[in-house]
Protein backbone atom coordinates (compact mmCIF):
# COMPACT_ATOMS: atom_id res chain seq x y z
CA UNK A 1 0.00 0.00 0.00
CA UNK A 2 1.43 3.34 -1.04
CA UNK A 3 0.35 6.30 1.09
CA UNK A 4 1.06 8.81 -1.65
CA UNK A 5 0.00 9.48 -5.19
CA UNK A 6 2.22 10.60 -8.04
CA UNK A 7 0.28 13.07 -10.12
CA UNK A 8 1.76 14.35 -13.33
CA UNK A 9 -1.46 15.97 -14.56
CA UNK A 10 -1.42 19.05 -12.33
CA UNK A 11 -0.39 22.31 -13.89
CA UNK A 12 1.42 25.07 -12.03
CA UNK A 13 1.84 28.42 -13.74
CA UNK A 14 0.94 26.76 -17.04
CA UNK A 15 3.67 24.11 -16.78
CA UNK A 16 3.24 20.43 -16.11
CA UNK A 17 4.34 19.57 -12.57
CA UNK A 18 7.03 17.03 -11.84
CA UNK A 19 6.23 13.76 -10.07
CA UNK A 20 4.74 15.36 -7.01
CA UNK A 21 4.33 13.12 -3.96
CA UNK A 22 1.08 13.98 -2.18
CA UNK A 23 -1.30 12.11 0.07
CA UNK A 24 -4.23 12.56 -2.35
CA UNK A 25 -5.03 13.08 -6.02
CA UNK A 26 -4.30 16.70 -6.92
CA UNK A 27 -5.96 16.65 -10.36
CA UNK A 28 -9.20 18.10 -8.99
CA UNK A 29 -7.55 20.90 -6.98
CA UNK A 30 -8.10 24.55 -7.76
CA UNK A 31 -5.27 26.71 -9.02
CA UNK A 32 -5.08 28.37 -5.60
CA UNK A 33 -4.79 25.00 -3.83
CA UNK A 34 -2.13 23.88 -6.29
CA UNK A 35 -0.26 27.13 -5.73
CA UNK A 36 -0.30 26.58 -1.96
CA UNK A 37 0.89 23.01 -2.45
CA UNK A 38 3.76 24.21 -4.64
CA UNK A 39 4.68 26.84 -2.03
CA UNK A 40 4.77 24.13 0.64
CA UNK A 41 6.89 21.90 -1.59
CA UNK A 42 9.35 24.73 -2.24
CA UNK A 43 9.50 25.73 1.43
CA UNK A 44 10.20 22.20 2.68
CA UNK A 45 12.77 21.39 -0.02
CA UNK A 46 14.54 24.73 0.47
CA UNK A 47 14.57 24.19 4.22
CA UNK A 48 16.13 20.75 3.77
CA UNK A 49 18.79 22.03 1.37
CA UNK A 50 19.75 24.76 3.83
CA UNK A 51 19.86 22.32 6.74
CA UNK A 52 22.00 19.86 4.76
CA UNK A 53 24.42 22.63 3.88
CA UNK A 54 24.65 23.72 7.54
CA UNK A 55 25.40 20.11 8.57
CA UNK A 56 28.08 19.78 5.89
CA UNK A 57 26.06 17.17 4.02
CA UNK A 58 27.03 18.23 0.54
CA UNK A 59 26.54 14.62 -0.62
CA UNK A 60 22.85 14.65 0.37
CA UNK A 61 20.90 15.23 -2.82
CA UNK A 62 17.28 16.26 -2.74
CA UNK A 63 14.98 16.07 -5.73
CA UNK A 64 12.98 19.23 -5.16
CA UNK A 65 10.08 18.02 -7.27
CA UNK A 66 9.51 14.80 -5.30
CA UNK A 67 11.03 15.53 -1.89
CA UNK A 68 13.33 12.53 -2.24
CA UNK A 69 16.74 12.40 -0.58
CA UNK A 70 19.03 9.64 -1.83
CA UNK A 71 21.53 7.92 0.48
CA UNK A 72 24.51 5.82 -0.55
CA UNK A 73 24.10 2.18 0.50
CA UNK A 74 27.87 1.74 0.38
CA UNK A 75 28.02 4.00 3.44
CA UNK A 76 25.00 2.52 5.21
CA UNK A 77 25.38 -1.21 4.63
CA UNK A 78 27.99 -3.84 3.87
CA UNK A 79 27.54 -5.79 0.63
CA UNK A 80 24.45 -8.03 0.75
CA UNK A 81 23.64 -7.03 4.35
CA UNK A 82 20.77 -5.16 6.00
CA UNK A 83 22.56 -4.24 9.25
CA UNK A 84 23.72 -0.63 9.50
CA UNK A 85 27.47 -0.19 9.52
CA UNK A 86 29.07 2.05 12.15
CA UNK A 87 29.86 4.52 9.36
CA UNK A 88 26.22 4.29 8.29
CA UNK A 89 24.99 5.08 11.80
CA UNK A 90 27.30 8.11 11.95
CA UNK A 91 26.03 9.28 8.56
CA UNK A 92 22.40 8.82 9.59
CA UNK A 93 22.99 10.73 12.83
CA UNK A 94 24.34 13.67 10.84
CA UNK A 95 21.60 13.37 8.20
CA UNK A 96 18.81 13.16 10.78
CA UNK A 97 20.17 16.15 12.72
CA UNK A 98 19.45 18.19 9.57
CA UNK A 99 16.36 16.37 8.26
CA UNK A 100 14.21 15.88 11.35
CA UNK A 101 13.87 19.51 12.53
CA UNK A 102 12.77 20.64 9.06
CA UNK A 103 10.35 17.75 8.52
CA UNK A 104 8.98 17.86 12.08
CA UNK A 105 8.27 21.56 11.62
CA UNK A 106 6.57 20.88 8.28
CA UNK A 107 4.42 18.17 9.89
CA UNK A 108 3.40 20.54 12.71
CA UNK A 109 2.55 23.23 10.14
CA UNK A 110 0.38 20.78 8.19
CA UNK A 111 2.63 20.75 5.11
CA UNK A 112 3.83 17.12 5.30
CA UNK A 113 1.81 14.01 6.16
CA UNK A 114 4.22 11.10 5.75
CA UNK A 115 7.88 10.13 5.51
CA UNK A 116 8.51 7.21 3.17
CA UNK A 117 11.73 5.19 3.48
CA UNK A 118 12.38 3.25 0.26
CA UNK A 119 15.01 0.61 -0.39
CA UNK A 120 16.46 -0.36 -3.78
CA UNK A 121 19.01 -2.90 -5.03
CA UNK A 122 20.95 -3.47 -8.22
CA UNK A 123 19.89 -6.22 -10.64
CA UNK A 124 22.52 -8.78 -9.57
CA UNK A 125 20.98 -11.89 -8.08
CA UNK A 126 17.46 -13.18 -7.69
CA UNK A 127 14.61 -10.67 -8.03
CA UNK A 128 12.70 -12.00 -4.99
CA UNK A 129 15.86 -11.91 -2.87
CA UNK A 130 16.57 -8.34 -3.98
CA UNK A 131 13.05 -7.27 -3.05
CA UNK A 132 13.44 -8.79 0.42
CA UNK A 133 16.88 -7.17 0.90
CA UNK A 134 15.56 -3.76 -0.17
CA UNK A 135 12.65 -4.06 2.28
CA UNK A 136 14.99 -5.09 5.10
CA UNK A 137 17.34 -2.18 4.43
CA UNK A 138 14.49 0.33 4.30
CA UNK A 139 13.08 -1.13 7.53
CA UNK A 140 16.50 -0.91 9.21
CA UNK A 141 16.75 2.80 8.36
CA UNK A 142 13.14 3.41 9.44
CA UNK A 143 13.76 1.61 12.75
CA UNK A 144 16.89 3.72 13.32
CA UNK A 145 14.89 6.90 12.73
CA UNK A 146 12.10 5.74 15.05
CA UNK A 147 14.58 4.83 17.80
CA UNK A 148 16.13 8.30 17.75
CA UNK A 149 12.95 10.23 17.01
CA UNK A 150 9.98 8.29 18.42
CA UNK A 151 7.66 11.23 17.69
CA UNK A 152 7.97 10.32 13.98
CA UNK A 153 7.04 6.64 14.43
CA UNK A 154 3.44 7.12 13.28
CA UNK A 155 4.31 8.99 10.07
CA UNK A 156 6.99 6.66 8.67
CA UNK A 157 6.14 4.16 5.92
CA UNK A 158 8.55 1.55 4.52
CA UNK A 159 8.70 0.38 0.91
CA UNK A 160 11.04 -2.15 -0.69
CA UNK A 161 11.45 -1.76 -4.44
CA UNK A 162 14.12 -4.37 -5.14
CA UNK A 163 15.70 -3.81 -8.52
CA UNK A 164 12.97 -1.49 -9.80
CA UNK A 165 14.08 2.02 -10.82
CA UNK A 166 17.71 1.21 -11.56
CA UNK A 167 20.09 4.14 -11.92
CA UNK A 168 21.73 4.29 -15.35
CA UNK A 169 25.13 5.72 -16.24
CA UNK A 170 25.88 8.04 -19.17
CA UNK A 171 25.96 5.10 -21.60
CA UNK A 172 22.52 3.90 -20.53
CA UNK A 173 23.92 0.93 -18.60
CA UNK A 174 23.03 0.07 -15.02
CA UNK A 175 25.15 1.83 -12.41
CA UNK A 176 25.05 -0.97 -9.84
CA UNK A 177 26.60 1.05 -7.00
CA UNK A 178 24.19 3.96 -7.49
CA UNK A 179 21.22 1.60 -7.83
CA UNK A 180 21.88 0.15 -4.36
CA UNK A 181 20.37 2.90 -2.26
CA UNK A 182 17.90 3.98 0.36
CA UNK A 183 15.76 7.04 -0.27
CA UNK A 184 13.82 9.11 2.23
CA UNK A 185 10.88 11.04 0.79
CA UNK A 186 8.43 13.44 2.38
CA UNK A 187 4.82 13.37 1.23
CA UNK A 188 2.92 16.66 1.04
CA UNK A 189 -0.32 16.92 2.98
CA UNK A 190 -3.29 18.00 0.89
CA UNK A 191 -6.14 17.90 3.40
Per-region residue spans from a language model:
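Second-shell loop/turn segments in exported
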Residues: 23, 30-38, 75-89, 127-131
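N-terminal targeting leaders that direct proteins to extracytoplasmic destinations
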Residues: 1-66
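Extracellular/periplasmic catalytic domains that process cell-envelope and extracellular macromolecules
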Residues: 61-63, 69, 109, 151, ...
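Compositionally biased, intrinsically disordered low-complexity regions enriched in proline and serine
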Residues: 3-7, 12-13, 78, 100, ...
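Periplasmic OmpA-like peptidoglycan-binding domain that tethers envelope proteins to the cell wall
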Residues: 82-89, 113-191
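Periplasmic peptidoglycan-binding/anchoring modules of Gram-negative envelope and division proteins
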Residues: 41-63, 77, 81-118, 146-148, ...
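A short acidic, often aromatic-flanked loop/helix-cap motif at beta-alpha or helix-coil junctions
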Residues: 67-68, 166
Amino acid sequence: WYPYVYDSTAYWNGELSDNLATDADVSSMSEQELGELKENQTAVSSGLMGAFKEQGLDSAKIDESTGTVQMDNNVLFAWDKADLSEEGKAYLDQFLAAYVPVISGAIEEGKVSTIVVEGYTDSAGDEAYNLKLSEERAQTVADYIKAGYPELANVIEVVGNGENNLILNGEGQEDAAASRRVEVRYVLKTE
